[in-house]
Every structure is written in C-alpha cells, then in structure tokens.
Amino acid sequence: MLLMLGLMALITFIDRTNISVAAPEIGREFGFSKTQLGTIFAAFGFAYALGQIPGGWFSDTYGARKVLTIVVLFWSLMTMVTAHAVGFVSMVVIRFVFGIGEASAWPAATRSMQYWFPKSERGLVNGVTHSCGQFATTLVPIVAVAIMTMWGWRAVFYVFGAVGIVWAIVWYFVNRDRPEECRAVNAAELAYIEDRTVGEAKTEAPAAEKKIPWFLILTSKNMWFIALAYCGYTYGSYFFWYWMPTYLMEFHHISLVKMGALAPLPLFAGALGVLTGGFATDFVYKRTKTLKWSRRAVCIASMLGASALMLPSAFSGDPVLTVIFLALCNFLISMSLAPSWAAAMDVAGGFSGSVSSVMNMVGQAAGSVSAIIFGALVEHVSWLAPFYVISGVMLGSALLWAFLINPERLVIDRS
C-alpha cells in the first residue's frame, strides 16, 4: 500500500512540475511574457484548488481504489495533451483541465492512509508519501532535460503521461479500500491498524456521522487556521516547483544543462525535509502522547527557519551559493508538510478526505496566486521582490501554528 501511494505521489509531482523545466523553451517558442508564464503555472493550481472539495467528497463516498484509478488515467492523458498546445489560451485551458484531474489525488490518498495506518504512524506515512513527490521534482530536471535535448519539449509530456497510465492499471488490480477487504491482512494486523487489542470489537461510527458534516467542517475555525498555515508551505513551494529553473537560467545566466545539474539539489533537499518532518512529528508524539506539540513544534521551527533563509537565497550573486541557500530553505519548508497533513487527519474524525481537501484547496489557491504574483513582480519590479513576499507569508504561517492551531480539537467538536 505504502509503495503504491508513494509511486502515486511521485507521478503527481512529475506531471505537475515537468512544465517548469520546459517553460524557458515554451516561452521562447510562443513568445510568452513572465506574467503569461505565471498564469499558465497558476491555471493548474486554481483548478486543483477548486477540485479539492469535490475530490474529498468523491474519495469519502466512493473510496480510493475507484477514484484514484479514474483520475490518474484522466490527468495522465491530459499531460500528453499538453504537447499539442498551440498558444497561450490553449495552454491555460489544458493546464486547468489537468489540474481538475489531479485534484482528487491527495484526498483519496489521505483516505486510504487513514484506513490502512494507525494514528501513531500517520506523520511518517505522510512524510514517506510526500517525500516521494518531492523526490519526483528532483528527477524532473534531470530526466526532462535529457528528453528535451534528444526530442524536444513536447516529448517530455508524452513520456511522463505514459507512466501514470501504467500506475492506474496496476493500482486497480492490487488495491483494496479497507484492510478488512484484503485477505492478506490477519486479525492482529487489523487490530494494530485500528489501535485496539485482538478480540476487541471494532467501534463503528454512529449512523448520523456517516454523512459528511460539511457545515461543521466549513465553520471550524481550527480547520481554517490549519488551512491558512498550510499556505506557508504551498506559497514557498510553488517557487521551487515552477519558477526556480527560469530564475536560475535568466537571473544567474546559466545554461539549460547547468540548470539541469543545479536545480535538483534544492528539490532533493525538500524530499529529505519531508521525511525529516514526518519522522520528527511521530517521534515527538510517541514521547509526549500529545498531538498538539508533535504537530505544532515541527511546523513552527520549519516555517521560521525557511522565512529567515529565503532572503539570503535571493541576494547571493553566485549560482552555486544560491542553490545551497535554496536547498536549506526548501528542506525547512518541506519539514512542515507531513505534520500539516497529519494535523488535518487528526482533526477530521472520520472525514479525512473532506477535511484534507479543504486544507489543500486553500493551500493550492495560495500557491496559484504566488505563481502569478512572482511573474508580475519579476516583470514589473525585479527578480528580488517576490522573495520578500514569500518570506513574509512563511512568517505568518509560523505565527498561526504558534498561537491559533490545536490539532487535538476535532472539526465536529463545538464544546
């Protein structure tokens, strides 16, 4: 299960970020401005954000097996269609539809994790799966540059799209929505997953709770604080996923090949950061038995550190030193990812797909805005201006985690 979810994470990030490596070539071929490129990057994010709540509902209603099979097939085909864009409007439309397809991926994966892993392992499981996604962004510059050198930028989308189609077919035949539906899972394993002793009856959710309580979810201050804090991660990460290759090539005047060698380093650091954050939040939880500080402490430290390092990254004139600062910054940003998703699962009760979809919707909307703002600031102010904004957003995230978020308070709790 963890292997398949990790591969899914890898595919989602490969397909959403491959355009960042192709962007300089696409921009030159079609004559796109920086603001137009930012809009193309953001088209995916806005669609991805809009599709989160429907994706969460589909996941909680129909299960991860069916939902992931359908959506991975769909977005993989849309990845291939990207190669047939003929201009700005068609590229925006294709990326928007592609984003709708990917929107159900993480709500469905989160639903699957909730059924298949105990509470004490949720941080690490989130860390492993999300680190696979981050590791994918490390591979993209290397593989995409090699493909582009041989066959051009359009071939990138054909190759990566085919990978997702293969995964969807395998997932449908090997996955089950719940561990009790899998004959390979014995009673002891099932009891461990459900945090109970062998022979103890499984606690069923009351009938009234089986209907998704959207009013309670959407009026939970705690849920909205988590969602807003998650914006610190997405706002910063969109720079690394979409703008960093162009920034290195145009601001530091390096070649496509050198960019392909340097860009993976901050992205690999991000993958390590996700794993570290997942391990750290579970380590603190197992020692303290408190969700409150196991989630908050990691996020506060990571966001404060990343905010402080973002500006030195911008002011370094040496591309290698810049990449080192960016690697440290992305490591810290990414440490907040696993505890953020674990917190969404913690407060969700039995509705993790729906709650996580709201959090991801808000976060991806913020990331989409950042892609446009970054391009506009570069075009009309300077390459340095957007780094101040990113640093400020991450500082705000740290303050939310420090003073307003309580991972132990359920969204349905109004006491």
What are these regions (language model features)?
Residues 31, 63, 84-90, 101, ...:
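Helix-breaking motifs and short loop linkers at transmembrane-helix boundaries and internal kinks
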Residues 94-134:
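Cytoplasmic helix-loop-helix junction between adjacent transmembrane helices
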Residues 133-182:
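Helix-loop-helix hairpin linking two adjacent transmembrane segments in secondary transporters
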Residues 50-89:
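Conserved MFS/SLC helix-loop-helix module at the cytosolic interface between two early adjacent transmembrane helices
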Residues 345-380:
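A late C-terminal transmembrane helix in Major Facilitator Superfamily
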Residues 149-162, 255, 294-297, 376-393:
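A membrane-interface helix-boundary motif in multi-pass transporters
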Residues 66-80, 292-311:
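Structural signature of the two symmetry-related core transmembrane helices
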Residues 19-20, 218-277, 334-341, 345:
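Extracytoplasmic gate region of multi-pass secondary transporters
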